[in-house]
Amino acid sequence: MRNVLAVTILSIPALVGAQQPAVIKLQPHNARLETAFTAITSIRELSDGRILVTDPRDLQLVVADFRTGDVRQISRRGGGPGEYGFAAPVHAIAGDSSLMADFLQRRVLLLDQDKIVATVAADNAVIRATQGFITFADRVGNVVSQKSSDPPEGQSTTSMKDSTAVIRVARRTGRMDTLAMVLVRPTVRTITRNAKGDISFSSARPLRLRVGEQFMLHPDGWLAVIRINPFRVDWRSPDGRWTLGAPLPVPVIRMSEKEKQASLARTARSMAANPSSTPIPPQLRTPDDDWPDVMPPYLQGETLFSPEGHVMIRRQPSADHPGVAYFVVDRRGRLAGMIEMKDNERIFAPGARSIYVVETDADDLRYIRRHPWPHSALPPG
């Protein structure tokens, strides 16, 4: 008898004004690390099943082995060769090679499995083009970043009419191409410059319940662009062909007093779970009347790929749908299903045939689980 699939597709009642999506249910995990993390920013699977994890608050850059439970730090913070100023996300490149942008020192570290083997200096063409801020990398020799206009001095507010360029830079030659334009997240910014014109102070406060368009580069070179109006996913192939997704059948939720109270309650719970030791400065406080006309369909910055290469987008919680859930959109721009998780769980990264989930306990400590995910779980994109 065939083994039970690690992912089972069920049906659920249709959302109001939308088609009936399939629920993709994860089976129990097959591995869990007992080491607690404080703030996980990336998980990168190696071919032997170990993972590289970045935890900039505590453990920094580590390699973890599910079989032995061993978690070992790689290098250390510092300015020397192979050291880093900040444990930024690790990106897979060819084979078991990876890169980590050390943007505080305007350089890039290259890894072979669990060893840092080279440091790319600030005069490299890739560093100059991206200023050290590398958002994604692929296995065919490119990195991706954003290129925005210089912010004006004083206080300004970006709107959904403002955009930024998604740029691709070839690691070998430094050639830069603009792949797409994406709308930025509406944000109030305050900039102060010194006599030389350099930024001496900067603050930013995203407007409440507003999101910008998002993009992701898959290791195979495909670019996913998550559009906001209408909510859809456009795909760009490595050779430049675009597949424009149709509007996703997700209901538009109008802002109401019920939604406002639900949002304020979510914010209060988050602040209680993550108390700040310093008061919030006035320019970063959200005005009481700062509400959009409609709820955004997704949360900013909580996207990832599935093992098949579909894009997974975390749904914006609402009064009627407060739980943690992810839309799964295939490479034709179709809604393939939805994954529902517990309130203390987040889907974090894909592996070759696995999905990695981060669970948070009552002390705000984070633990990594691995769930099997066969490639037959979803239709191909």
Show the residue positions of the predicted features.
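Positively charged n-region of N-terminal signal peptides that target proteins for export
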Residues: 1-4
